[in-house]
Regions:
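Flavin-dependent oxidoreductase catalytic core characteristic
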Residues: 1-650
Length: 650
């Protein structure tokens, strides 16, 4: 069996520098590594080895204790989203209160007046009030503007009357709602004097803070078991003429006079602020779950030996090109996702800093970019978990590998906070607007979309002889060809008599999706490339450049149609791309373990028997089956005898 330590000793990269890129700075990487090391010593934050044999109720209660232990470890700095990194990496499942701390608190800080912040923020942070983010309804999710819950202003009492007028209007799916929350940030249609002023947000108490019983007019509970998120109390909520004070509508950008005059200011997209902050979290913290999958799968691939070579020695499965093909492009994509996520995070912070000053100029670009990255990144994490599971054979199928839980716990992210197809369509809409802007006002195109300033130059690019220096130009060419063809297709449908909305909905969906997704792949490449420029260690820069090129070549090979259709490349170029792909697999294989271990993950957070740091998969797996699996400690003799008696007699 290949020793993991031998593989590590052969590595030539500087893991400290790489960890600094991953976590934003070497100091932050050191803090996360120390946090994860501290977790190894605290029993309360460990996930029990027999966790997946437990009932949902027992799992829920254990995670409640774990969540509070994590909060103690971060000194209750729950309003600092960076502090979530350690707990989310270490925990096997989603954490209690995570949704409301990541969404309700930011919403209050961005959408609330100072008086409202003073009234609620401290209680929320200290969890004296536990609030859920009650937006999604039984009948509507991504289509926020069609929500049916109503908040009708009563001028006589200076109150809002909250109602769910239909069964479809019932809030359904909000996390922390089913059991834990006693307050809800409710999104409802604002009705004043019979006029609908659109969806606004309201702080509504739903349970008594002492008895935890539902208040009058409230029907609330848990929606039941799910594919993943078993310890998350996703809930349902109905209102029957529930009255709340006028003060409870978050009112920094909208207000109502006592007489019922409605006044709005700022960008309408500001109402999506908390969703944007949650998408930032999905961009920066959750992708590190893919590092867990790859750490397990790569360690196992170095230690697992199958079939002999020509010298009669068993090969580590990582030596096989098919195994490299499964895992190394995922490793390259992981770095592209994480490093571009860091860049996006800074843009989000800049946007909301400017919003607080009354400057909304970055809002559209920020919202659109977050839509696309959220869709691309969350799909990647789930896809990565599945391929890592497959790469570990039968062991990958078992919970003791640590891989099934990653797939289950991150699958919901593909749908929550904006279903991924809808998210790509929102980005595509913005890209088409940029196409028009490029013709009239190219100076107004944001930096993150600057390739739209060079459309003619990009459209004229041809590549007869592939070199790695051409990867960026080829990605740019794919993006611009796809979006311009989509724009022309839309014009043709409109000129043929179809209205724009019908063309969008029924004729352009796949083209729009492909354009948006490809733009994000290009964006990831650019961010990855720019981040490598910060590396000072020469060999590390070489290895990361190889990893970057593998990412780029993989994208080009997976999606070459736009380049071939527009004669940007030839069949010979495609062959050169395939040859370079195989060459890059060979170059990256010796460094793959050290690259993924730059994420500083601790064994307890991996929750695996097959991918631990000391490389003893068989010892840990057998020990778990013999000593930890509670099913083996139950006497089933009576059950077996009863089954014998039930067998048909021939």
């Amino acid at each position: 069996m290949t020793s993991l330590e031998q593989v590590r000793q052969l590595s030539k990269i500087d893991q400290i520098q790489i960890a600094g890129l991953i976590f934003g700075s070497e100091q932050r990487a050191k803090e996360v590594k120390q946090f994860l090391a501290d977790c190894e010593k605290i029993p309360e934050v460990q996930t029990n080895a027999d966790f997946y044999n437990w009932s949902r109720k027992k799992q829920f209660l254990s995670k409640d204790k774990q969540g509070f232990s994590f909060m103690k470890m971060i000194n209750n700095q729950v309003d600092d989203m960076e502090q979530y990194t350690g707990p989310m990496i270490y925990s096997a499942t989603t954490n209690h209160y995570g949704v409301y701390l990541a969404m309700v608190v930011p919403a209050l800080k961005i959408l609330g007046t100072q008086e409202q912040i003073n009234a609620w923020l401290d209680d929320l942070i200290q969890i004296r009030k536990a609030a859920c983010y009650a937006q999604t309804e039984l009948g509507h999710g991504s289509d926020i503007q069609s929500l049916q819950t109503t908040a009708t202003y009563d001028k006589g009492t200076q109150e809002f009357v909250i109602n769910t007028p239909t069964i479809q209007a019932a809030k359904f799916w909000p996390g922390d709602l089913g059991i834990l929350a006693n307050w809800a940030l409710v999104f409802a249609q604002l009705i004043v004097d019979g006029t609908n002023y659109g969806v606004q947000s309201f702080m509504v108490q739903i349970r008594d803070e002492q008895t935890h019983k539902p208040l009058k007019g409230i029907e609330v509970g848990d929606i039941g078991p799910k594919m993943g998120y078993q310890v998350k109390d996703n809930g349902f909520l109905k209102f029957d003429n529930v009255r709340i004070p006028k003060f409870n509508m978050l009112a920094k950008y909208i207000s109502i006079s006592p007489q019922g005059k409605v006044m709005k200011e700022g960008d309408p997209k500001i109402s999506y602020a908390s969703m944007m902050m949650m998408r930032k979290l999905l961009n920066t913290v959750y992708p590190k779950a893919a590092a867990i999958s790859l750490t397990i799968a790569l360690r196992y691939s170095y230690t697992r030996q199958q079939f002999t070579n020509d010298k009669g020695v068993e090969n580590s499965v990582i030596e096989y090109q098919t195994q490299q093909h499964k895992l190394l492009p995922l490793l390259a994509n992981l770095f592209a996702v994480v490093l571009s996520g860091n860049v996006t995070s800074k843009f989000v912070d800049l946007n909301f800093t400017e919003v607080q000053k009354g400057n909304f100029s970055h809002m559209n670009a920020c919202h659109s970019l977050l839509c696309g990255t959220k869709a691309n990144y969350t799909h990647f994490v789930v896809n990565c978990a599945e391929w890592c599971r497959l790469s570990c054979g039968g062991h990958g199928y078992a919970h003791y590998s640590g891989l099934p839980s990653i797939y289950q716990e991150h699958s919901p992210n593909v749908t929550l906070e904006g279903e991924n197809q809808i998210m790509f369509l929102q980005l595509a809409r913005y890209l088409l607007k940029l196409l028009k802007t490029s013709q009239k006002n190219p100076e107004k195109i944001p930096e993150q979309f600057s390739l739209f300033k060079r459309i003619n130059e990009i459209l004229s690019f041809k590549c007869d002889q592939f070199q790695t220096s051409n990867i960026l130009s080829l990605l740019e060419s794919s993006v611009i060809h796809l979006i311009t063809q989509t724009g022309m297709k839309m014009m043709q449908e409109i000129q043929g008599g179809m209205n724009p909305k019908a063309a969008w909905d029924y004729k352009l969906g796949t083209s729009l999706w492909e354009s948006a997704n490809y733009f994000i792949e290009y964006y990831k490449f650019v961010c990855f490339q720019n981040t490598i420029l910060l590396v000072t260690h020469k060999q590390t820069q070489v290895v990361l450049t190889n990893l970057l090129n593998l990412f780029g070549v993989t994208i080009l090979l997976q999606n070459p149609l736009a380049l071939l259709e527009n004669d940007v490349i030839t069949q010979q170029t495609m062959k050169q791309l395939r040859d370079e792909y195989e060459n890059l697999l060979n170059l990256i294989k010796p460094e793959a373990l050290s690259l993924v271990e730059s994420f500083c993950l601790a064994d307890g957070g991996l929750r695996t028997t097959i991918g631990r740091a000391d490389g003893k998969p068989y010892e840990y797996t057998y020990d778990w089956a013999v000593n930890e699996n509670s099913l083996n400690k139950i006497d089933f003799s009576n059950t077996v005898n009863q089954l014998k008696n039930c067998r048909p007699k021939l």
